[in-house]
Regions:
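Alpha-helical lid/collar subdomain of P-loop NTPases
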Residues: 196-358
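AAA+ P-loop NTPase catalytic core and its hallmark functional loops
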Residues: 1-212, 217-220
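Exposed alpha-helical structural elements
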Residues: 5, 9, 99, 103, ...
Length: 501
């Protein structure tokens, strides 16, 4: 299965294992709760999906890379204990609590949550001395004398032997006690993820145009060559950072992430071409309404004269800008909702604003440590606290530092904050109303419009906006394309009927 399907399998398993009856007992017997083993090539996102499930299901995640551990850190250190058996006194060996099990209990104490995910990466590459211990854990959910608490799902990950010489095979006894989930590198799943994650438009466009370039691992007599999903995503982040700083991107930089010369050179050429199209067409100016009639007419002629690659890139440039607008609206909307909820929580409590903000920051620290929320969510939450803190300082300067006066002051500031959200709504609506007519003028209702509507429909951010605020341009385009599809289907039925006669 692809990485997104594997993510849903983890989510569904977590929910099934944690389901409880009317008495609060787990419906799924603990002895039947098999650990999940994600087995797939490196860099496809196995670790990332486990982190995402933990955040989305609001459970703590304890993660360990097993190649960094010895038998002592997994099982615990030996200690001498005194025992009496059958009237005789003995000195016996016991073990301290496993570091891994200890981390699980710490997560439970720090978060106040009794259920979570224990993720063990590179599990089939452990040392020879640790291998029997790991097999015992997968079979019995115990390290030494200490068992994993109830309510914790074990997810392990590893690479097949062809990708790692250090791999150890599991025996049939272990395999019969786990759920082996093979994970494949999927270009389509990556594009879906990348569009929502805000990856660089050149990468999304290139991989949509050349899906065979998405993933590659090979070895020759000189070196190992590889191109992975992780490499594409990390390259995307650096490209965006370099562009924001005005730093030129060289071909050697691309090769640091795409370790296959043919692919790195080919993508670098496309990246430069994509950038030149972006500058030549002025997509940002078109969607922002800053282009005059002569400018639009010139770009229309340019697009109509372009080859398939140029047209494909133009549509993707427009989609990239639309995704930026949708993301900006989504951030503003989420900010306003979270800001309102945080302020309401403060109004309900009787303490000072300073104590409230300190408690919230402590809670954020716990969420950060156990990955209960994404880095972006935590950054946004910290930004909300800083904003309320700033408003609190302004309230003191206005002699409205506490009580009902402070509440009125904060509510007034919040009302002003909502205007920024309205600006993002107007921006997104206008961009859709300009993008669709522009491409229609350029290409009619051709394949370019189908590509545009597919990109919009496949974007959760844009569809969430349209579902909430509507878009006459989008709905009209959908109607036209659906009519064309129905007409084509009717013509095909007529043709078949004539052929039968």
């Amino acid at each position: 299965m692809n990485i997104q399907q594997a993510k849903e399998e983890i989510r569904n398993t977590l929910r099934a294992y944690l389901q409880k009856d009317g008495e609060g007992k787990y419906c799924f017997p603990t002895v039947r709760q098999r650990p999940l083993l994600l087995m797939g090539p490196p860099g496809v996102g196995k670790t990332a999906i486990v982190e995402q499930v933990a955040r989305e299901e609001q459970v703590p995640l304890v993660a360990y890379t097993m190649t960094h551990h010895t038998r002592q850190s997994a099982v615990g250190l030996p200690k001498i204990a005194e025992r009496d058996y059958c009237g005789r006194h003995f000195s016996v060996t016991e073990y301290t609590m496993s570091e891994i099990i200890g981390a699980v209990y710490e997560a439970m104490d720090r978060t106040g949550k009794r259920e979570g995910i224990l993720f063990l990466d590179e599990i089939n590459c452990v040392s020879e001395t640790l291998a029997p211990t790991m097999l015992q854990f997968l079979q019995n959910k115990t390290f030494g004398n200490h068992a994993l608490p109830e309510g914790w799902l074990i997810v392990a990950a590893g690479n097949p032997p062809e990708y790692n010489k250090s791999v150890r095979d599991f025996n049939i006894v272990t395999l019969d006690r786990i759920r082996n989930i093979p994970v494949e590198a999927s270009q389509q799943a990556f594009l879906t993820y990348g569009a929502e994650a805000g990856l660089h438009g050149a990468i999304l466009s290139y991989l949509a145009l050349k899906p065979e370039k998405f993933y590659h691992v090979s070895r020759d007599e000189n070196a190992l060559h590889y191109v992975t999903a992780r490499g594409w995503e990390d390259l995307s982040r650096l490209l965006q950072s370099y562009e924001s700083l005005g730093i030129p991107v060289e071909e050697a930089l691309v090769g640091e992430f795409l370790n296959l010369e043919e692919t790195s050179r080919d993508f670098y050429d496309y990246y430069r071409l994509y950038g030149s199209y972006g500058r030549d067409y002025g997509v940002r100016e078109i969607l922002a309404g800053e282009a005059d009639t002569a400018f639009l007419a010139d770009r229309k002629a340019m697009a109509q004269a372009g080859d398939f690659t140029e047209r494909f890139a133009l549509v993707n440039l427009i989609l990239e800008q639309l995704r930026r607008y949708a993301a900006a609206y989504g951030r503003e909307d989420a900010l306003d909702v979270a800001l309102h909820e945080t302020m309401q929580a403060f109004f309900r409590q009787n303490g000072s604003l300073e104590d409230f903000l300190a408690a919230r920051r402590n809670a954020l620290q716990t969420k950060r440590q156990f990955r209960l929320e994404s880095a972006d969510s935590l950054t946004a939450a910290e930004g909300i606290l800083r904003k309320i803190e700033q408003w609190g300082l302004e309230a003191k300067q206005a002699r409205c530092g506490d009580g009902a006066a402070l509440e009125r002051f904060l509510k007034a500031r919040f009302d002003g904050q909502l205007e920024s959200r309205q600006g993002k709504i107007r921006q997104m609506t206008a961009a859709l109303d300009r993008a669709i007519p522009f491409l229609t003028d350029c290409f009619g209702d051709g394949q370019e419009l189908t590509l545009l509507i597919t990109g919009i429909t496949g974007s959760k951010g844009m569809m969430a906006f349209i579902a909430r605020h509507g878009s006459d341009s989008y709905l009209a385009l959908c109607g036209r394309l659906q009519c064309q599809k129905n007409e084509a289907q009717l013509q095909e039925l007529c043709r078949r009927a004539v052929e039968k006669k």
